[in-house]
């Protein structure tokens, strides 16, 4: 029993005394003083500088977060409409001007009419391509499949006339301008090939008609070249090689 009592006294034995309680209180007071001193130091830190209200108003963001300020001019449909209206037409961007095409056609159809050099100096291949296709189509309707001859003679003839004009003129001329003028002047030959659909041109009438058409084409081409390149007094020198070129087209058309 004595051992059991000693065990109980050992089990419930504690070193806690009043002195320890006072020491704990002193420690808590020290902690409180330490916390208070830290709080006082935090309150004594320097405050940020004063910023005027005008500066805040000028640099502040007028919109809201996640909601940008709307721009009525940017999102208005009228701005898109105005941008489309200011764009040039598609035909003008492609270089197709029906007014100039019609003026060049009238210049070719009337050899006595003076040519406008500013218009004829343009590189317009819309009319020449149409006239070449029309010549091939009329020859096809007349029973002559000569598309290869038409395109081949056109390309070789343009190269020859281009080289000749660059040697004769001081300003020089582009290949596109030569092809444009020779292509437009092919229109009378289209008229001759259209006549070959309805009656035969192998005879005196056909020969005379072919000579008239050759002179018509070469006269129109030489007139346009002299006007566009300022080659006054050299029209006959230019008309001779043009007559040789259009004579080949006449041979294909008649025979």
Swiss-Prot record:
GO cellular component: cis-Golgi network; endoplasmic reticulum membrane; endoplasmic reticulum-Golgi intermediate compartment; trans-Golgi network
Gene Ontology biological process terms, A to Z: endoplasmic reticulum to Golgi vesicle-mediated transport; vesicle fusion with Golgi apparatus
Spans within the Lumenal topological domain: 146, 202-204
One Pfam family recorded for the sequence: Yip1
Cytoplasmic domain ranges by topology: 1-124, 168-180, 226-234
Topological type in the membrane: Multi-pass membrane protein
Transmembrane segments: 125-145, 147-167, 181-201, 205-225, 235-255
Keyword Transmembrane appears in the UniProt entry: yes
Family matches, as InterPro entries: Yip1/4-like, Yip1_dom
Subcellular location(s) of the protein: Endoplasmic reticulum membrane; Golgi apparatus, cis-Golgi network membrane; Golgi apparatus, trans-Golgi network membrane
Highest taxon of source: Eukaryota
UniProt keyword list: Endoplasmic reticulum, Golgi apparatus, Membrane, Transmembrane, Transmembrane helix
Main location as per UniProt: endoplasmic reticulum
Family listed: Belongs to the YIP1 family.
Listed name of the protein: Protein YIPF7
């Amino acid at each position: 029993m004595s051992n059991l009592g000693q065990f109980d006294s050992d089990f419930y034995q504690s070193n806690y005394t009043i002195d320890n309680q006072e020491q704990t209180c002193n420690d808590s007071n020290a902690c409180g003083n330490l916390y208070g001193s830290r709080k006082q130091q935090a309150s004594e830190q320097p405050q940020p500088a004063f910023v005027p209200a005008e500066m805040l108003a000028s640099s502040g963001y007028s919109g809201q977060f996640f909601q940008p300020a709307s721009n009525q001019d940017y999102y208005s449909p009228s701005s898109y409409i105005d941008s489309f209206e200011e764009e040039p037409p598609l035909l003008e961007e492609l270089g197709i001007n029906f007014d100039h095409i019609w003026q060049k056609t009238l210049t070719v159809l009337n050899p006595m009419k003076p040519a406008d050099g500013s218009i004829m100096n343009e590189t317009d291949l819309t009319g020449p391509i149409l006239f070449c296709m029309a010549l091939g189509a009329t020859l096809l309707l007349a029973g002559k499949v000569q598309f290869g001859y038409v395109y081949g003679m056109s390309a070789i003839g343009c190269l020859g006339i281009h080289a000749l004009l660059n040697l004769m003129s001081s300003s020089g001329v582009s290949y596109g301008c030569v092809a444009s003028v020779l292509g437009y002047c092919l229109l009378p030959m289209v008229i001759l090939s259209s006549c070959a659909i309805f009656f035969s041109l192998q005879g005196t009438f056909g020969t005379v008609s072919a000579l008239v058409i050759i002179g018509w084409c070469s006269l129109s081409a030489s007139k346009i070249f002299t006007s566009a390149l300022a080659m006054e007094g050299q029209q006959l020198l230019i008309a001779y090689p043009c007559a040789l070129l259009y004579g080949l087209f006449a041979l294909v058309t008649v025979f």
